[in-house]
């Protein structure tokens, strides 16, 4: 259980760090995929 909770906290921390920095490549890819203009 400790290992599972540690992994959850790790992924949550990474996701929060990426969401806090809009200039990361990960967020650019997500925004591009989810943007309406990308579907055109």
Curated annotation (Swiss-Prot):
Keyword Signal: yes
Coiled coil segments of this chain: none
GO CC terms of this entry: extracellular region; extracellular space
UniProt KW keywords: Behavior, Secreted, Signal
Tissue: Lumen fluid of male accessory glands, becomes seminal fluid.
Signal sequence segment: 1-17
Subcellular location field: Secreted
GO terms of biological process kind: egg-laying behavior; regulation of female receptivity; sexual reproduction
Stated role: Transferred from male to female during mating and may affect egglaying and behavior after mating.
The protein's name: Accessory gland-specific peptide 57Db
Natural source organism: Drosophila melanogaster
Taxon lineage: Eukaryota, Metazoa, Ecdysozoa, Arthropoda, Hexapoda
